[in-house]
Protein backbone atom coordinates (compact mmCIF):
# COMPACT_ATOMS: atom_id res chain seq x y z
CA UNK A 1 0.00 0.00 0.00
CA UNK A 2 1.08 3.59 -0.39
CA UNK A 3 2.27 5.76 2.45
CA UNK A 4 -0.36 6.03 5.17
CA UNK A 5 -0.38 7.31 8.72
CA UNK A 6 -0.46 4.72 11.48
CA UNK A 7 -1.98 5.54 14.83
CA UNK A 8 -0.78 4.11 18.15
CA UNK A 9 -3.46 1.39 18.05
CA UNK A 10 -1.99 -0.16 14.89
CA UNK A 11 -4.70 1.07 12.54
CA UNK A 12 -3.92 2.81 9.28
CA UNK A 13 -5.90 5.99 8.68
CA UNK A 14 -6.35 6.31 4.94
CA UNK A 15 -8.59 9.38 5.21
CA UNK A 16 -5.57 11.56 6.09
CA UNK A 17 -4.06 11.00 2.64
CA UNK A 18 -4.32 13.91 0.26
CA UNK A 19 -5.08 11.89 -2.88
CA UNK A 20 -7.71 9.15 -3.23
CA UNK A 21 -6.57 5.60 -3.96
CA UNK A 22 -8.11 2.71 -5.83
CA UNK A 23 -7.60 -0.92 -4.84
CA UNK A 24 -6.99 -3.58 -7.48
CA UNK A 25 -6.80 -7.35 -7.47
CA UNK A 26 -3.09 -8.22 -7.66
CA UNK A 27 -3.74 -11.12 -9.99
CA UNK A 28 -5.88 -9.49 -12.72
CA UNK A 29 -5.76 -5.75 -11.82
CA UNK A 30 -9.54 -5.42 -11.62
CA UNK A 31 -10.56 -2.44 -9.49
CA UNK A 32 -12.52 -3.62 -6.45
CA UNK A 33 -12.79 -0.45 -4.31
CA UNK A 34 -11.43 2.97 -3.44
CA UNK A 35 -10.30 4.92 -0.39
CA UNK A 36 -13.50 7.01 -0.31
CA UNK A 37 -15.15 3.94 1.27
CA UNK A 38 -12.30 3.43 3.78
CA UNK A 39 -13.38 2.30 7.24
CA UNK A 40 -10.38 0.89 9.10
CA UNK A 41 -7.26 -1.23 8.85
CA UNK A 42 -6.16 -4.04 11.18
CA UNK A 43 -2.41 -4.53 10.93
CA UNK A 44 -2.46 -7.70 13.01
CA UNK A 45 -4.81 -9.32 10.47
CA UNK A 46 -3.08 -7.74 7.44
CA UNK A 47 -6.44 -6.48 6.26
CA UNK A 48 -8.40 -3.30 5.69
CA UNK A 49 -12.14 -2.71 5.52
CA UNK A 50 -14.22 -0.71 3.06
CA UNK A 51 -17.87 0.17 3.53
CA UNK A 52 -18.54 -0.47 -0.14
CA UNK A 53 -16.99 -2.30 -3.09
CA UNK A 54 -17.24 -1.85 -6.85
CA UNK A 55 -20.41 -3.47 -8.14
CA UNK A 56 -19.84 -6.56 -10.33
CA UNK A 57 -16.14 -6.69 -9.38
CA UNK A 58 -16.50 -8.59 -6.11
CA UNK A 59 -18.58 -11.68 -5.42
CA UNK A 60 -19.70 -12.61 -1.89
CA UNK A 61 -19.82 -16.41 -1.61
CA UNK A 62 -23.07 -17.97 -0.36
CA UNK A 63 -21.36 -20.36 2.07
CA UNK A 64 -20.44 -19.34 5.60
CA UNK A 65 -17.14 -20.30 7.20
CA UNK A 66 -15.93 -20.13 10.77
CA UNK A 67 -12.58 -18.54 11.72
CA UNK A 68 -9.81 -20.73 13.19
CA UNK A 69 -10.46 -19.39 16.70
CA UNK A 70 -14.21 -19.94 16.25
CA UNK A 71 -15.11 -16.35 17.14
CA UNK A 72 -16.12 -15.15 13.66
CA UNK A 73 -18.44 -16.31 10.90
CA UNK A 74 -17.70 -14.96 7.43
CA UNK A 75 -18.28 -15.33 3.69
CA UNK A 76 -15.34 -15.19 1.31
CA UNK A 77 -14.95 -12.33 -1.19
CA UNK A 78 -13.77 -13.29 -4.67
CA UNK A 79 -12.69 -11.23 -7.65
CA UNK A 80 -15.28 -11.75 -10.41
CA UNK A 81 -12.67 -11.62 -13.17
CA UNK A 82 -10.08 -14.15 -11.94
CA UNK A 83 -12.01 -15.87 -9.08
CA UNK A 84 -9.15 -15.18 -6.63
CA UNK A 85 -10.26 -15.03 -2.97
CA UNK A 86 -9.36 -11.47 -1.94
CA UNK A 87 -11.13 -11.00 1.39
CA UNK A 88 -14.10 -11.66 3.65
CA UNK A 89 -17.44 -10.26 4.75
CA UNK A 90 -17.81 -10.92 8.48
CA UNK A 91 -21.37 -11.86 9.45
CA UNK A 92 -20.70 -12.50 13.13
CA UNK A 93 -17.81 -11.02 15.14
CA UNK A 94 -16.71 -10.46 18.73
CA UNK A 95 -17.28 -6.95 20.12
CA UNK A 96 -13.77 -5.72 19.31
CA UNK A 97 -14.40 -6.42 15.59
CA UNK A 98 -17.87 -4.85 15.41
CA UNK A 99 -16.55 -2.06 13.19
CA UNK A 100 -15.94 -4.50 10.30
CA UNK A 101 -19.12 -6.59 10.52
CA UNK A 102 -21.17 -6.68 7.27
CA UNK A 103 -18.50 -4.70 5.41
CA UNK A 104 -15.88 -5.66 2.84
CA UNK A 105 -12.63 -6.71 4.52
CA UNK A 106 -9.81 -7.22 2.02
CA UNK A 107 -6.49 -9.02 2.50
CA UNK A 108 -3.59 -6.61 2.01
CA UNK A 109 -1.50 -9.27 0.27
CA UNK A 110 -4.23 -9.89 -2.36
CA UNK A 111 -4.69 -6.27 -3.45
CA UNK A 112 -2.53 -3.40 -4.56
CA UNK A 113 -3.25 0.30 -4.12
CA UNK A 114 -2.85 2.93 -6.79
CA UNK A 115 -2.88 6.51 -5.56
CA UNK A 116 -4.60 8.81 -8.05
CA UNK A 117 -2.90 11.98 -9.20
CA UNK A 118 0.19 11.43 -7.10
CA UNK A 119 2.39 9.03 -9.04
CA UNK A 120 2.96 11.05 -12.20
CA UNK A 121 6.55 10.42 -13.23
CA UNK A 122 8.56 12.47 -15.68
CA UNK A 123 11.31 11.03 -17.91
CA UNK A 124 13.99 11.63 -15.24
CA UNK A 125 12.07 9.38 -12.83
CA UNK A 126 10.97 12.15 -10.47
CA UNK A 127 7.44 12.32 -9.09
CA UNK A 128 5.34 15.42 -9.70
CA UNK A 129 5.82 16.41 -6.04
CA UNK A 130 9.62 16.26 -6.39
CA UNK A 131 9.46 18.26 -9.63
CA UNK A 132 7.24 20.86 -7.91
CA UNK A 133 9.77 21.18 -5.06
CA UNK A 134 12.67 21.59 -7.49
CA UNK A 135 10.72 24.16 -9.49
CA UNK A 136 9.89 26.05 -6.30
CA UNK A 137 13.57 26.12 -5.31
CA UNK A 138 14.50 27.33 -8.82
CA UNK A 139 11.84 30.04 -8.67
CA UNK A 140 13.15 31.24 -5.29
CA UNK A 141 16.70 31.36 -6.70
CA UNK A 142 15.51 33.28 -9.77
CA UNK A 143 13.54 35.69 -7.61
CA UNK A 144 16.59 36.35 -5.45
CA UNK A 145 18.77 36.83 -8.54
CA UNK A 146 16.26 39.23 -10.12
CA UNK A 147 16.02 41.27 -6.91
CA UNK A 148 19.81 41.61 -6.70
CA UNK A 149 19.93 42.65 -10.37
CA UNK A 150 17.22 45.23 -9.74
CA UNK A 151 19.11 46.64 -6.75
CA UNK A 152 22.29 46.91 -8.86
CA UNK A 153 20.32 48.54 -11.66
CA UNK A 154 18.86 51.10 -9.24
CA UNK A 155 22.34 51.89 -7.91
CA UNK A 156 23.80 52.28 -11.42
CA UNK A 157 20.79 54.31 -12.55
CA UNK A 158 21.21 56.68 -9.61
CA UNK A 159 24.95 57.03 -10.31
CA UNK A 160 24.27 57.64 -14.00
CA UNK A 161 21.73 60.38 -13.21
CA UNK A 162 24.26 62.03 -10.89
CA UNK A 163 26.98 61.92 -13.58
CA UNK A 164 24.57 63.33 -16.20
CA UNK A 165 23.63 66.20 -13.89
CA UNK A 166 27.31 66.96 -13.24
CA UNK A 167 28.13 66.90 -16.97
CA UNK A 168 25.17 69.08 -17.89
CA UNK A 169 26.08 71.59 -15.19
CA UNK A 170 29.65 71.77 -16.56
CA UNK A 171 28.48 72.30 -20.15
CA UNK A 172 26.09 75.15 -19.37
CA UNK A 173 27.64 78.58 -19.69
CA UNK A 174 27.52 80.52 -16.50
CA UNK A 175 25.04 83.32 -16.65
CA UNK A 176 26.72 86.35 -15.29
CA UNK A 177 25.02 89.27 -13.76
CA UNK A 178 25.67 92.93 -14.74
CA UNK A 179 28.43 93.30 -12.17
CA UNK A 180 30.36 90.32 -13.54
CA UNK A 181 30.29 91.83 -17.03
CA UNK A 182 31.46 95.20 -15.72
CA UNK A 183 34.35 93.54 -13.86
CA UNK A 184 35.42 91.68 -17.02
CA UNK A 185 35.24 94.89 -18.98
CA UNK A 186 37.43 96.73 -16.42
CA UNK A 187 39.99 93.93 -16.43
CA UNK A 188 40.04 93.97 -20.21
CA UNK A 189 40.39 97.76 -20.38
CA UNK A 190 43.26 97.72 -17.85
CA UNK A 191 45.14 95.21 -19.95
CA UNK A 192 44.67 97.19 -23.10
CA UNK A 193 45.92 100.46 -21.53
CA UNK A 194 49.19 99.06 -20.54
UniProtKB/Swiss-Prot annotation:
- Decide whether keyword Cell wall biogenesis/degradation is in the record: no
On the tree of life, the source organism's domain of life is Eukaryota
- Name the residues that bind Zn(2+): 25, 28, 79, 82
The residue ranges flagged as biased composition, category Basic and acidic residues, are 174-186
Subunit annotation: Homotetramer. Component of the CENP-A recruiting complex composed of at least mis16, mis19, mis19 and mis20.
- Name the protein family: Belongs to the mis18 family.
Name of the protein described by the UniProt record = Kinetochore protein mis18
Report the gene name: mis18
Amino acid sequence: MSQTETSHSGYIDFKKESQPSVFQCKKCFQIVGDSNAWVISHREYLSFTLSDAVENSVRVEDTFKRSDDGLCVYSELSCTRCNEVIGKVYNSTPIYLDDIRDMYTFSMDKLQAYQLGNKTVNPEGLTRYQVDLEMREDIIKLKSFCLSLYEKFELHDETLRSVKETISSLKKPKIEGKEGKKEKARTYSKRTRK
